[in-house]
Every structure is written in structure tokens, then in C-alpha cells.
């Protein structure tokens, strides 16, 4: 008799995806982040669902409803901080996952990569809208500044901004629709993640060597399930430590001041995970130019497969490209730091240099270096 997991119509799908899936035997811990992202999404949906039961999307009561959750609801403080810091863990895993894809050449699986970029944009949009919901000073002014960027679009810009706001400023209509979208989008993210996996399982996973591993595959369970559980335990330990010991470490003090349209905070800045893009936006003096640079800082990932000039898929055996990759990581950390600094000398100059370097590495230096490596290896 056939095992039920191989014959049952529903269990068969799960079996082919998570149990009997043939997987390269050489996957390192860099391949853990996909499953960690899945766990992050589940944690965010569950904590978000319970928070939504107590939240009111009205400008007069939103701030007080969040305070009420923290003070009066059983373990409400835990839910709130798990949700806020869970977003930080989500983005840490997300950036590691994208970095892994860049380093090991996983972008050559273009369908999977493009769905991944769409996922990245959707997660960023969801996080931005969630940041607005507590209706604090930074929420309100962050929403005003970022949505206002759309007014840089020629001809339709101003109308588009007012359409998104639902009025002539960020107000009740804006908050209500942001709450609606913030609740809806995670389920769309879950659906997209399934499509992401569907395309991945069409080609099979990449591996650290970048060499086809069809002759050396092992079942996903028990080998990689155990490995993923270890990664999960490490992530949950870090998240628990963050939530229980220092829940406001990654936040901003202005998030404890109710929104006041008449008083602008001294430094308007987004959460830490958007600071690199914010620094690129600020480094260009022109509004439209800044908006284009902001969008391109993420959309540039879509052209990476077309710029792959190396004869090897992975960077494992390419030391020159490795140096450039780690320079890119350092550059992104620099941009993140600059994004949180005031707009004054020398931060403006450092931000402009780092922004130019970011685009130069991805668009110019990496393809050229790959060609040089091909010649050095006489390929």
C-alpha cells in the first residue's frame, strides 16, 4: 500500500514541497532564510490579527487604542512588541536572503527572482503602512513625507497624492485605508510566497558551488528540516531577547508622542530597514530625481540577471567579485547610518558618495570584474 503522504491529493503537494523534495547536499546556512521568512510571516499575521482586534483606525482613538493594548490587554505589550520587532527580524532575514541570491547567483532563475522582487516591494509597502497605524508624530509625518513624493510625478502627481490621502492632507481617510491595506497585504504576500516556491521547485535549488547538483541530491526531510529548526531557534532567541529586554531599541522616541499636524519633528526618518533607500532619496537635490533613485535602488535587482557576464554562476570561486560584494554590503551599512543622520555637512557628501558607489558597483563594476575574471581564467 502506498504511503498516504504520497497518495492523498493534498498531502501529496506538501510531500513534494517539504518532505521528499530532492535538495542539493551542500546547502549552507545561507539557505535557511527562506524558511525563516515563512515563520516571520506567520508570526506577523498572527500577532497582527490579535492586535487588530483591539485597534481602532480613527485619528482620535488610534494612539490611545495602541496604548490600551499595551496597558490593559493580557500580554498586549508582548503582542505589540513581537509585531514591531518581528518586522525588524523579517527585514533582516529578507536582506540576508537577497544578499545570498546575489552572492551565489540565484538570480539566474529569473522567474523566482522576479517574484522575489515583487515580494520585496509588497513587504516594504506593508511595513510602511503598518508604521503609520499607531498615529504618532513619526507615523504622521513619515506618511506625509513619503506619500508626498508621488507629487513629483509629472502632470498627475498632485491628483495622485490627494487620491491616496482621500483628502487634502493625511487624515482619517488615509489612516482607515492604510489599515485596510495593511491587513490585506500579508495574505497576498503569503500567496506570492507560494508562487515563489512553485517557480523554485520547477528548477530546483541552487547550491554554494554554482555547479548543477542533479547527481547529488538528498531528501529535504529530515536533513534540512532539522537544519531549518536550528536556524528558527536562533532567530526566535534573538527576537525574544529583543522583545523582552530592549523592545524599543530599534524604534524612535517620537513614536511615543501622539500625532500633531501643527508640529514637525526635528528629524523625520523611517524605520531602520528603510534608511538605506531614504539616504539615496535624500542624496539627490531634485525631487523627481530623488524619487526615481529611491525606486531604482530596489528595482535595480531586476536588471542583475541581464548584467551577469561571468562564466560561473556563483561567486564562490571568484575572489575579485567577492571583494566587490562585501564592498556593497559595507556601502549599504554606510547608507543606513547616513539615513538616520541630520541633513548637514559632512553627512550629505558621504550619502552622495555612498549612493553613487551603490549604483556603480551593481551596474558597472560587477559586470566588468566578471569579464576580467573570465579572462584571468582564460574562459
Curated annotation (Swiss-Prot):
Checking Pfam families in the record gives:
Cytochrom_B_C (PF00032), Cytochrome_B (PF00033)
* Keywords, alphabetical: Electron transport, Heme, Iron, Membrane, Metal-binding, Mitochondrion, Mitochondrion inner membrane, Respiratory chain, Transmembrane, Transmembrane helix, Transport, Ubiquinone
An example of a Gene Ontology cellular component annotation for this protein is:
mitochondrial inner membrane
Q: What function does the entry list?
A: Component of the ubiquinol-cytochrome c reductase complex (complex III or cytochrome b-c1 complex) that is part of the mitochondrial respiratory chain. The b-c1 complex mediates electron transfer from ubiquinol to cytochrome c. Contributes to the generation of a proton gradient across the mitochondrial membrane that is then used for ATP synthesis.
| Family of the protein in this entry | Belongs to the cytochrome b family.
Kindly indicate whether the keyword Transmembrane belongs to this entry: yes
Q: Does the keyword Heme apply?
A: yes
Q: What is this protein called?
A: Cytochrome b
Major localization class: mitochondrion
Amino acid at each position: 500500500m502506498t504511503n498516504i503522504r504520497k497518495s492523498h491529493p493534498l498531502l501529496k503537494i506538501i510531500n513534494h514541497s517539504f518532505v521528499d523534495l530532492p535538495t542539493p547536499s551542500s546547502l549552507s546556512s545561507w539557505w535557511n532564510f527562506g524558511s525563516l521568512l515563512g515563520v516571520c510571516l506567520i508570526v506577523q499575521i498572527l500577532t497582527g490579527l490579535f492586535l487588530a482586534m483591539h485597534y481602532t483606525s480613527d485619528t482620535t482613538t488610534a494612539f490611545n487604542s495602541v496604548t490600551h493594548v499595551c496597558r490593559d490587554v493580557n500580554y498586549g505589550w508582548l503582542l505589540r512588541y513581537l509585531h514591531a520587532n518581528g518586522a525588524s527580524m523579517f527585514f533582516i532575514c529578507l536582506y540576508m536572503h537577497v544578499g545570498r541570491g546575489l552572492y551565489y547567483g540565484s538570480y539566474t532563475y529569473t522567474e523566482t527572482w522576479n517574484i522575489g522582487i515583487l515580494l520585496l516591494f509588497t513587504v516594504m509597502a506593508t511595513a510602511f503602512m503598518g508604521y503609520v497605524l499607531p498615529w504618532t508624530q513619526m507615523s504622521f509625518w513619515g506618511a506625509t513625507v513619503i506619500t508626498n513624493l508621488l507629487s513629483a510625478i509629472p502632470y498627475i502627481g498632485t491628483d495622485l497624492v490627494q487620491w491616496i490621502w482621500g483628502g487634502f492632507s493625511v487624515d482619517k481617510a488615509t489612516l482607515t485605508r492604510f489599515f485596510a491595506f495593511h491587513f490585506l497585504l500579508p495574505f497576498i504576500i503569503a500567496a506570492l510566497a507560494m508562487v515563489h516556491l512553485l517557480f523554485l521547485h520547477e528548477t530546483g535549488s541552487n547550491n554554494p558551488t554554482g555547479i548543477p547538483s542533479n547527481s547529488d541530491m538528498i531528501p529535504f526531510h529530515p536533513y534540512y528540516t532539522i537544519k531549518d529548526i536550528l536556524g528558527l531557534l536562533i532567530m526566535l532567541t534573538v527576537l525574544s531577547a529583543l522583545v523582552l529586554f530592549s523592545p524599543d531599541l530599534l524604534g524612535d522616541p517620537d513614536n511615543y508622542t501622539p500625532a500633531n499636524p501643527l508640529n514637525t519633528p526635528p528629524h523625520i526618518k523611517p524605520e531602520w530597514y528603510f534608511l538605506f533607500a531614504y539616504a539615496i532619496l535624500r542624496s539627490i537635490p531634485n525631487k523627481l530625481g530623488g524619487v526615481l533613485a529611491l525606486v531604482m535602488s530596489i528595482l535595480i535587482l531586476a536588471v542583475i540577471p541581464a548584467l551577469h557576464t561571468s562564466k560561473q554562476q556563483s561567486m564562490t570561486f571568484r575572489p575579485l567579485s567577492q571583494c566587490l560584494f562585501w564592498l556593497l554590503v559595507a556601502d549599504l551599512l554606510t547608507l543606513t547610518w547616513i539615513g538616520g543622520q541630520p541633513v548637514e555637512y559632512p553627512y550629505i557628501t558621504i550619502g552622495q558618495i555612498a549612493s553613487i558607489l551603490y549604483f556603480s558597483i551593481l551596474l558597472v563594476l560587477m559586470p566588468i570584474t566578471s569579464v576580467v575574471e573570465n579572462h584571468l581564467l582564460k574562459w
